[in-house]
Design a protein with these regions (language model features):
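Feature of Fe-S/electron-transfer and energy-metabolism proteins
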Residues: 1-240
């Protein structure tokens, strides 16, 4: 279906856009607000101007990706205006780490990698460890050849991912985090770096976040890009160069 182009403010969705289509898109849609119907999704009965009208998507609600394409991923102010870091603020100001874990357990949230392991159980196991030095690691490498899920979030809404790591860190009382991302994702790496720097400038990352006494430092590790075949320790071992 790609390359896909969404035209704001009309919300038109164009499919399989080629370079030679750009002039028509500019003249009809950008200048006159008219749709280019031949580039839209259609079946035997209807042309669908927006993604939301397409039957497959009509009953769906975007959650994780809802800001992607609607905010400038390199400006933290736009992310904050869209609600970024509000959940972290609620967690750190209104809830104990134990309450955060219970909330995640009660939500039924599970991993999306296929195994469906309950996220709250994973967090509670980490929080229950005797060792007080803990880490939060985000697997942005994806592992599966050709996978594209995590890249979409890292490139389109990096602050959402960072906030999730911060909530996890507060819940398990970790003060260091690592994002393991493919070196083949240069745009994702760049936007994550910018997002981390901007969050640090706003006092949302680093020491004594928002004056709460909780500290969390985030680092990026660029992986070589390999299929780890589901071996759970491979990624973490590569972080410490074993």
């Amino acid at each position: 279906m790609g390359p896909l182009v969404r035209i704001e403010p009309y919300n038109y969705l164009y499919l399989k856009v080629k370079l030679e289509d750009c002039e028509e898109i500019f003249e009809k849609t950008i200048l006159r607000g008219e749709p280019v119907e031949r580039l839209m999704y259609h079946d035997d009965h209807k042309v669908y101007e927006t993604q939301e009208e397409i039957p497959f998507y009509a009953e769906q609600t975007r959650l994780v990706l809802k800001n992607c394409g609607h905010i400038d991923a390199e400006h933290i102010e736009e992310a904050i205006a869209a609600g970024a870091y509000e959940s972290f603020e609620k967690a750190v100001f209104e809830m104990t780490p134990e309450a955060v874990i219970k909330s995640v357990l009660d939500s039924g949230l599970r991993g999306r990698g296929g195994a469906g392991f309950p996220t709250g159980r994973k967090w509670s196991q980490v929080a229950g460890q005797k060792e007080k030095v803990r880490y939060v690691v985000c697997n942005g490498d994806e592992g599966d050849p050709g996978a594209f899920m995590d890249r979409s979030v890292m490139e389109g809404d990096p602050h959402r991912m960072i906030e999730g790591m911060m909530i996890a860190a507060y819940a398990v009382q970790a003060h260091e985090g690592y994002i393991y991302v493919r070196a083949e994702y240069p745009l994702a790496v760049r936007r994550l770096k910018i997002a981390i720097e901007q969050a640090e400038e706003k006092g949302l990352l680093g020491d004594n976040i928002l004056g709460t006494g909780f500290s969390f430092h985030l680092h990026i590790n660029r992986g070589a890009g390999a299929f780890v075949c589901g071996e759970g320790s491979a990624l973490t071992l590569s972080l410490i160069h074993i």
